[in-house]
Design a protein with these regions (language model features):
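N-terminal alpha-helical scaffolding segments that mark the starts
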Residues: 1-56, 73
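Residues that mark the junctions of alpha-helical repeat units in TPR/alpha-solenoid scaffolds
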Residues: 18, 46, 68, 75, ...
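"A position-specific structural signal for the A-helix of alpha-solenoid helical repeats
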Residues: 20, 24, 74-77, 81, ...
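Amphipathic alpha-helical segments of tetratricopeptide repeats
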Residues: 54-62, 103-111, 160, 200-211, ...
Length: 352
């Protein structure tokens, strides 16, 4: 493992190389099989490595000069990884300050978000709810723009050819998503929602001038996590329609491509989730969304391996999907007939 002598002259290339090596080794340790008697042993080793790296970066700051923003951003990258480890080893009290420091470094403004207000409050007027929702959207956009600018500016003054702009952008998303999961677990869903909306806004920025240059794979992975978490948070906030929409997006992302990924969930489970979501959309009158979910459910149910579950054969899931498909068509037909009747009535009145 490359190390940096704090007393040596500042060497940005050496710092970049050590950052690469440290984070790669920490990731390797995180992915090792967990020992049965000491399940967090490898994660503790990764945490120690990252903590030592933070100490080295802190020691490098006094001599960083014009590259100070870059070194601070590298610190934020390490803190985001430390936050994830703190959460994984069931120490949210340790994860919290790490995420806060990562957000302050990479997504300024996000660390100050709180759980106040609720634009889903039934007692609030419609105008008040609309204004609160608009304020949340504006805040999310502001944080996203500030984050992209922070990452861009840090990369511009970093080590030549080793600025890590894409990695720093990914770390910002990692901190936003991780902090959101943390606060959702602490029963502060509004705070989690605001963090996730900031992540969602940041993920839309790469195509805009000045956006952080994420790789396609990094961006897609982060987007899927954000959408998945938003589905849960919106459900906690009582926004069933938004939760269903994010669920549908999550399912779609898991099912597309030549090699569908279910993240440990069996294809049969995903098929049942799709059909359940389709029923919700039928009840809401969202017929096209219901049909899309039915198609996804059938596709998942027909993947190899689902017949291994004797208690829930794929045939019954496919049948449920077809039944829901029929209900969606019936709902669509009823809507069409009702519209025709309304038009006919209006035409008749106009004729008289």
């Amino acid at each position: 493992m490359a190390a940096l002598d704090a007393s040596a002259s500042f060497d940005a290339s050496a710092i970049a190389k050590a950052q690469d090596e440290t984070l790669a080794e920490a990731e390797r340790l995180n992915l090792l099989p967990a020992p049965e008697k000491t399940p967090f042993e490898n994660k503790y080793a990764a945490r120690k490595l990252l903590q030592e790296r933070c100490e080295v970066l802190q020691a490098a700051l006094p001599g960083a000069g014009t590259t100070t923003p870059w070194v601070r951003a590298l610190l934020g990258e390490c803190e985001a990884a430390l936050g994830d480890i703190g959460y994984d080893v069931e120490e949210p009290h340790a994860a919290d300050p790490c995420y806060a420091r990562a957000l302050a470094a990479l997504a300024p403004g996000a660390e100050a978000l709180d759980d106040s207000g609720d634009h889903g409050d039934e007692d609030a007027s419609e105008e008040a709810r609309i204004q609160a929702a608009a304020a949340d959207e504006e805040t999310a956009e502001d944080i996203a723009v500030a984050s992209a600018a922070r990452v861009r500016d840090a990369a511009l003054v970093g080590a030549p050819k080793h600025a890590r702009g894409a990695e720093l952008g990914a770390a910002a998303l990692r901190a936003l998503n991780g902090a959101a999961v943390l606060w959702q677990g602490r029963e502060q869903p509004r705070r989690a929602f605001r963090l996730l909306k900031a992540a969602e806004a940041l993920e839309r920025l790469p195509s805009l001038p000045g956006g952080a240059g994420f790789s396609a794979d990094t961006l897609r992975e982060a987007e899927t996590k954000t959408i998945y978490y938003l589905a849960q948070v919106c459900a906690s906030l009582g926004d069933g329609a938004a939760s269903a929409n994010y669920c549908a997006q999550t399912l779609e992302r898991q099912l597309v491509g030549p090699a569908p990924s279910f993240d440990g969930v069996t294809p049969l489970d995903w098929a049942k989730n799709c059909v359940g979501l389709a029923r919700f959309f039928v009840d809401q009158g969202a017929v096209l969304d219901a049909m899309s979910c039915c198609r996804a459910g059938v596709a998942a149910a027909r993947l190899d391996g689902v017949d291994d579950d004797p208690d829930e054969p794929r045939g019954s899931v496919v049948a449920d999907a077809h039944k829901c498909w029929a209900q969606a068509h019936a709902s669509r037909a009823e809507s069409f007939i009702a519209t025709r009747r309304t038009v006919a009535t209006c035409t008749e009145k106009d004729a008289h």
